[in-house]
């Protein structure tokens, strides 16, 4: 199950007791997937940075999970929908994705490079069509929504489904034992060839809210 929290940093996740809560319910053979790096770059000052408090906190996650016989998995942050003039994704996470790759190699932890997979995904979709994977809706799409929604970080159901497929493909390519439980008809996923939007069906909940989540 998920204990994720919007706008969280590894160090704040630990400080809020959420890691401790997860550890109390963790059993040998469980998996802990850690995807951070979106909000960490806002942290400035002594001891902050990708190769300082960020990496130290992630090392705590890894050590605590392994001490309980669980499998830690590092997941680099999804790209933001930020294109340059040539239709290529701009890197907006500074050196945080690279720090996670370095830590994964050093600690021999499986890595799902969602940062690179989503670069491929968004560029394959294109500048305008990629809006269909995000919370981009004209005013009046939902009850009480009086303004345009243009969020280039958070996904709508179609986008979230493509990201989920990236994670599943990452699990398979990393050779994690949990991949043995994938459906027998799973044929893989290539982010360079995302599912057609009209092939995705989703029934909206009757309950909606239009507040943008924290984080960017």
Question: Residue locations for each model-derived region?
Answer:
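Alpha-helical cap/lid subdomain in secreted, periplasmic
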Residues: 17-183, 205, 212-216
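Short, small-residue-biased leader/transition segments that mark boundaries at the very start
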Residues: 1-9
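A short, charged, Gly/Pro-tolerant segment at domain boundaries
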Residues: 184-202
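Structural motif
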Residues: 10-17
């Amino acid at each position: 199950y998920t204990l994720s929290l919007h706008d969280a940093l590894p160090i704040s996740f630990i400080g809020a007791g959420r890691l401790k809560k997860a550890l109390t319910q963790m059993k040998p053979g469980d998996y802990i997937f850690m995807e951070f790096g979106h909000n960490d770059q806002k942290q400035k000052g002594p001891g902050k940075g990708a190769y300082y408090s960020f990496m130290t906190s992630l090392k705590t996650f890894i050590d605590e999970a392994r001490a309980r016989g669980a499998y830690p998995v590092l997941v680099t942050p999804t790209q933001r929908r930020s294109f340059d003039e040539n239709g290529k994704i701009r890197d907006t996470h500074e050196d945080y994705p690279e720090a996670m790759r370095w830590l994964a190699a050093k600690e021999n932890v499986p890595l799902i490079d969602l940062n690179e997979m989503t670069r491929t995904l968004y560029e394959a979709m294109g500048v305008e069509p990629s809006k269909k994977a995000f919370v981009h809706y004209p005013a009046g799409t939902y009850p009480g929504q009086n303004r345009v929604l243009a969020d280039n970080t958070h996904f709508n159901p179609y986008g979230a489904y493509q990201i989920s497929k990236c994670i599943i493909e990452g699990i398979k390519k990393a050779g994690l034992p949990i991949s043995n439980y994938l459906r027998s008809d799973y044929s893989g996923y290539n982010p360079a060839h995302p599912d057609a939007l009209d092939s995705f069906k989703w029934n909206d909940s009757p309950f909606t809210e239009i507040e943008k989540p924290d984080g960017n």
